[in-house]
Swiss-Prot record:
PANTHER family registered for this protein in UniProt: TR-TYPE G DOMAIN-CONTAINING PROTEIN (PTHR43381:SF5), TRANSLATION INITIATION FACTOR IF-2-RELATED (PTHR43381)
Location in the cell: Cytoplasm
Entry keyword set: Cytoplasm, GTP-binding, Initiation factor, Nucleotide-binding, Protein biosynthesis
Basic and acidic residues: compositionally biased ranges: 79-89
Top-level taxonomy: Bacteria, Pseudomonadati, Aquificota, Aquificia, Aquificales
Name of the molecule in the record: Translation initiation factor IF-2
Region of interest (G3), residue spans: 362-365
Annotated residues for binding of GTP: 315-322, 362-366, 416-419
Pfam families referenced in this protein's UniProt entry, alphabetically: EF-G_D2, GTP_EFTU, GTP_EFTU_D2, IF-2, IF2_N
Annotated region (G1), positions in chain: 315-322
Region of interest (G4), residue spans: 416-419
InterPro entries, A to Z: EF-G-like_DII, EFTu-like_2, IF2_II, IF2_N, P-loop_NTPase, Small_GTP-bd, T_Tr_GTP-bd_dom, TF_IF2_bacterial-like
């Protein structure tokens, strides 16, 4: 047989006397074409294909004959085997049956009986009773014997039946195997099939192993701790991934950093999570030491004792806050001191006839909420909102309500000045109901008390309501532990040095205690109560003026008693260093809020809104709130008419909000404070601009959508190697256009093997900017030379689109 390339499938089929279809099926299965197309009768065959066909079909007839002969030879052998098996079964059955024959058992029993009778005759004669007893015993023994024999017989029959069933099943399986159609294959085909089966089995085991490993990895929770200061290189080493992958993840989050640059800790956590880790920022050793030193003692229920409630009185100017506090304290401070009680210690405590006490914050309500809350302090338990019955709800009243609601402090409404002729307490109730404060008598949950601070009417009832609410809140503290408190206000006294008003929240503060407060520390040299009397100790909820600070503390700082001066000094110094580092990064910016919204950290965009008119306020508030959707909410935490004040800035700082001013400007104090606290204030003259800016915040202005667009496709038809240049691809542009400097991919057999850019583009030795469809050109890919004829070059560009709501 001649093995040449000229032979076609149909020629070989005729030569071997088989159908072309059989050979085509064989080739498609065991020798597919390189281009993936099916074989046809007209296709030419190479040497290897011919060899496989002759091996498979050349000895077909001989194999068939051999199979017929073997089948004939096997037939009588199988018959003989069956006969032998049947004989064996019969023998087994006979053996079992032999053992079970009742005649044999009867003969044996009779023989035994005869022997026993002879023995009995030889023995001396027994009494009738003994004989009867023996007969009965024998009968019992015989019954037992028969029972045992019967059980043995049944067991043997059962064993035989089981064996028969097993043999029947085996025969059925053998028949099924024999009935299966046998595929006639040559030795070479059998070898190929064996190898294929082995390869499939091997691949199957590998796949199972991979799946097990994958499942094991998924089940394992990888936890890592990221230090507060970490570079890209260190992060890559920690995650055990290449640095370029870390840089790519950082770029996705809008952070451009080189391998030696530091990564913000919150971004490092996100990158770690993208690689399947559960990450958290590792606290500095100094911070951990501080936490250990300042760790609160475990509270035991039996050590806790009721403490007086801390109440803040809020309301609009001239609605009677100072007069009410004056009436409660039964003093005349408002008349004797310039500026009222706010010029005194800053807080006061009153004792009622029944011995119970209430602590009142004398600082203005809004200041108590903003300045203190901005630094994370939680001092106030209850707020009393004073509203004049003859004036109704005013701008500062609404501001006070918003402050209280923002921090979930329960409100008691004191409707003041009911002694005036034009007083209308019901009007106050109606107006406050519109702001969510519905009276209890109307089915709501807000306590309303009609009072007259001037005459003292119903003031006792107001105090009862405060104590009732305090009982419901179950306010308790442990007076026997080291003291913790909050600084309400501080001042620098020329004679006494730094002085601060402190409300003790837990434990008891004593003269001589060493303490740390924010970034300063000290030792209690002296304490004075709200009436100016010197005291040696201050239990929970007691306001005192403290002397002994090294530096002036800030309002809102937490005062914590420690063991000694050295501990206090070390903690204060470390806090000061940390604060200096944080001040460089800490700022409330709109851009930061964008990022928080995108990462799901912030679910609502908080806004303090100030406008020139009520109409503008209502229109802008409605427009901004309509931008809310299921994912992100716009929340106007405070809206009012007028200029941007110091209070607005502090509220924004406290609640993480931005300030939007429409046709308004911040006053000098507010401007100074916004720069100091770094609160973002946005000023607008057109409603549309304000809406657009907030809209951009919601959709994520700093994270545009990345989109890729293919602009052209070319086919490589020749390659040229040029010294000092590399491989140049001679291309034909199939569609679109190729652009010099544009991004490009090299595709070979459907697989991307290069992704870079077009370094140079030429037409007849001339550099060109672009080449359109239907033209030839020379293309040099940047830093890549392994280009082959038949490859395709895909030219594309990346566009960034802004997301929409």
């Amino acid at each position: 047989m001649s093995l040449t390339k000229t032979k076609r499938v149909s020629d070989v089929a005729k030569e071997l006397g088989v159908k072309s279809k059989e050979i085509i099926e064989f080739l498609n299965e065991y020798y597919p074409r390189p281009d993936g197309k099916p074989w046809k009768a007209s296709h030419g065959l190479d040497e290897q294909a011919l060899e496989m066909i002759y091996d498979a079909f050349g000895i077909k007839e001989e194999e068939e004959k051999e199979e017929v002969v073997t089948e004939q030879a096997q037939a009588p052998a199988e018959v003989e085997e069956k006969k032998e098996e049947e004989k064996k079964e019969e023998v087994i059955v006979e053996e079992v049956v032999e053992e079970k024959k009742p005649e044999v058992i009867v003969e044996e029993i009779e023989e035994k009986k005869e022997e026993e009778e002879k023995k009995e005759e030889e023995k001396p004669k027994k009494s009738v009773e003994e004989l009867i007893k023996e007969i009965l015993e024998k009968k019992e023994k015989e019954k037992e014997k028969k029972k045992v024999e019967k059980e043995r017989k049944e067991e043997k029959v059962r064993v035989v039946e089981v064996k028969k069933e097993e043999r029947k099943e085996e025969k059925k399986e053998e028949k099924k195997e024999e009935e299966k159609p046998k595929i006639k294959m040559s030795k070479k085909e059998r070898e190929i099939m064996r190898k294929l089966e082995h390869a499939v089995e091997k691949e199957k085991k590998k796949q199972e192993k991979r799946e097990k490993e994958k499942k094991k990895k998924e089940e394992e929770v990888k936890i890592i701790y990221i230090p507060e200061v970490i570079t890209v290189r260190e992060l890559a080493e920690l995650l055990d991934v290449p640095a370029n992958k870390v840089i790519a993840e950082l770029m996705k989050r809008g952070v451009l950093a080189t391998i030696n640059q530091p990564v913000p800790p919150e971004v490092a956590v996100e990158v770690a999570e993208s690689f399947g880790y559960l990450a958290e920022v590792k606290k500095e050793e100094e911070e951990l030491e501080e936490e250990a030193l300042l760790k609160e003692e475990e509270e035991r229920e039996e050590e806790l004792q009721p403490r007086p409630p801390i109440v803040v009185v809020m309301g609009h100017v001239d609605h009677g806050k100072t007069t009410l506090l004056d009436r409660i304290r039964k003093t005349n401070v408002a008349e004797r001191e310039k500026g009222g009680i706010t010029q005194h210690i800053g807080a006061s405590q009153v004792e009622l006839p029944d011995g119970r006490k209430i602590t009142f914050l004398d600082t203005p309500g809004h200041e108590a909420f903003t300045t203190l809350r901005a630094r994370g302090a939680k001092v106030t338990d209850i707020s009393v909102l004073v509203v004049a019955a003859d004036d109704g709800v005013m701008p500062q009243t609404i501001e006070a309500i918003n402050h209280a609601k923002a921090f979930n402090v329960p409100i008691i409404v004191a409707v003041n000045k009911i002694d005036k002729p034009n007083a209308d307490p019901m009007k106050v109730r109606r107006e406050l109901s519109e702001h969510g404060l519905i009276p209890e008598e109307w089915g709501g949950d807000t306590i309303f008390v009609d009072i007259s601070a001037k005459t003292g009417q119903n003031v006792d009832q107001l105090l009862e309501m405060i104590l009732l609410l305090a009982d419901i809140l179950e306010l308790k503290a442990n007076p026997n532990k080291k003291a913790r408190g909050t600084i309400i206000e501080s001042k620098l006294d020329r004679k006494r040095g730094p002085v601060a008003t402190v409300i003790v929240e837990d434990g008891t503060l004593r003269v001589g205690d060493h303490f740390v407060a924010g970034t300063t520390y000290g030792r209690v040299r002296a304490m004075f109560d709200d009436k100016g009397r010197q005291v040696k100790e201050a239990p929970p909820s007691t306001p005192v003026e403290v002397l002994g600070f090294e530096e002036l503390p800030e309002a809102g700082d937490e005062l914590i008693v420690v063991d000694d001066e050295r501990t206090a000094r070390e903690i204060a110094e470390k806090r000061k260093e940390k604060k200096e580092r944080e001040e460089k990064l800490q700022t409330i910016r709109l851009e930061d809020i964008y990022k928080k919204i995108q990462t799901g950290e912030t679910k609502e965009l908080r806004i303090v809104l100030k406008t020139d008119t009520m109409g503008s306020l209502e229109a802008l508030k409605k427009s901004l709130e309509e931008l809310s959707n299921e994912k992100v909410q716009v929340k106007i935490i405070h809206g009012a008419v007028g200029g941007i004040t110091e209070n607005d800035i502090m509220l924004a700082k406290a609640s993480g909000a931005i300030v939007i001013g429409f046709n308004t400007r911040p006053d000098p104090k507010a401007r100074e404070l916004m720069e100091k606290e770094k609160v973002d204030v946005r000023l607008y003259g057109v409603i549309y601009e304000a809406i657009e800016d907030v809209k951009k915040a919601l959709v994520g202005l700093l994270e545009p959508i990345k989109k890729e667009e293919v602009i052209g496709m070319a086919e490589v038809r020749a390659t040229f190697k040029i010294k000092k240049v590399g491989t140049v691809a001679g291309c034909y542009v199939l569609n679109g256009k190729l652009v010099r400097g544009a991004k490009a991919r090299l595709i070979r057999e459907g697989v991307v093997i290069y992704d870079g850019e077009i370094e140079s583009l030429k037409r007849f030795k001339e550099d060109v900017q672009e080449v359109t469809a239907g033209y030839e050109c020379g293309v040099k890919l940047k830093d890549y030379n392994d280009v082959k004829v038949g490859d395709q070059i895909e030219c594309y560009e990346i566009r960034y689109e802004k997301p929409t709501l």
